[in-house]
Amino acid sequence: LNIKCQLENLLSDQQDKTAISLNETYKRCKQWTDKTLEDIENLLTFSVDAYGLKACIQPTDIRELLTQITTEYRQNNSIGKQIDIQTEISPTVPLAQVDPLLLYSALGNLLGNAIKYSGTKVRIRIGCRREAKKWILTVQDDGYGIPPEEQKFIFQEYKRGQRYKGDKQRKGFGLGLCYVAAVVKAHHGHIQVNSDGKQGTEFIIEIPQRKAKRRKARS
């Protein structure tokens, strides 16, 4: 509501449009946005802890889902980095039985981390293929990497990399990967991370293939 009020003030004819006034309004909007995101993270943490995540499985076009994610991050580059996102999707990928909303948010989280934990330039590759009876999704970047000693607990709550603790520019690392792991678990899948700790990180998600549920014939 506070953000809405500030934005309405910006659009109002009576609003002072001087540079100083606009700057103060933008600062208030950012403060309330940060507070809202913090509240959402706390709510997500409570929900995951108390209830877990339940996937709403439905036929999903993985190619379209990945296209939507990459397009969103290419267009909404508010931090001014040079971002190169490439996709490697098998041309014969059929519909997958997954929860599109949960999977979208999980992959978006990994993509956001790849951008956040990198220098001024970052190259990201997102892959998708079907192998045997499972889906394999990968998110690979050439960012800072994750030290081997930290990789074993990064999917636990609030376990944020030591090198980024106290860094206000890189919030949310602790809950984000915990949430991603919860999404994968809700799909009865598995997630792993590969990194030499110096440069680059790859997350590999494996989700078992499900058969589409047949509708019961009406009697």
PLM feature spans:
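Short beta-strand/loop element within the Bergerat-fold HATPase_c
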Residues: 121-133
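Conserved catalytic submotifs in the C-terminal HATPase_c
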Residues: 58, 82-94
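Short alpha-helical segment of the dimerization/phosphotransfer core of two-component systems
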Residues: 28-36
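Conserved micro-motifs of the catalytic ATP-binding
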Residues: 51-56, 95-98
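Short conserved segment of the HATPase_c
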Residues: 146-158
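Short helix-loop "hinge" at the ATP-lid/N-box region of the Bergerat-fold HATPase_c
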Residues: 114-115
